[in-house]
Amino acid sequence: LLQLSGGVTDNVKPSGLSKSLVDNFLNVDGTPVDPTDEKYKDFNEVFKDRDGRLLAMVMHTGCKFKSNSLMNVRAYDETGTEEEQKEKNKDISSPRLNGDGIYKNVTGFHTRLGIDTTYVTGNCETAHVMFRYAEGLLCYAEAAAELGLYNDGVAEKTLKPLRQRAGVAYVTPAADPHFPFQGLPPAVQEVRRERRSELS
């Protein structure tokens, strides 16, 4: 769904990150989000005091990225003359907020992660990491949790450093009533939540 090297996002068919993924990211105090809370009807509240990785992953108020040069009037914004469109879109290209048909974002959450903010036509690329150190930590933590061996020592080496880097407090795992997969032990839930937040 991304054209990362082109400095644009959400440019292919129905796109958008799920609300479930957005709700997966914890508050900075380490507590899970209550998706039924009325305050989250305000788009800006969704991002307030949340895991820093959410802000890196999802476009929010104030996000910008450089666009490739506009050769034609954009199909999803047919207002104004071609010259007016070129002038309007020469520096910043917004996601397809008002697209229709196959070009609409079906969730309202646009991908930000991986966008090249310094894009120059034909003169850049965005690297894709093949395997991250964080993934190794998460594999270790999940194996320990699955085997019933997850404890403070494992947390100290795995989840705590990841949360600290994201600016989120570490809280001892407890069952989350809003976790999508109920019936899992709290430690497994916590590691899988962290994996989803870290690697999304």
Q: How would you describe each model-predicted region?
A:
Residues 1-19, 23-200:
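Acidic/polar-rich alpha-helix caps and helix-coil junctions
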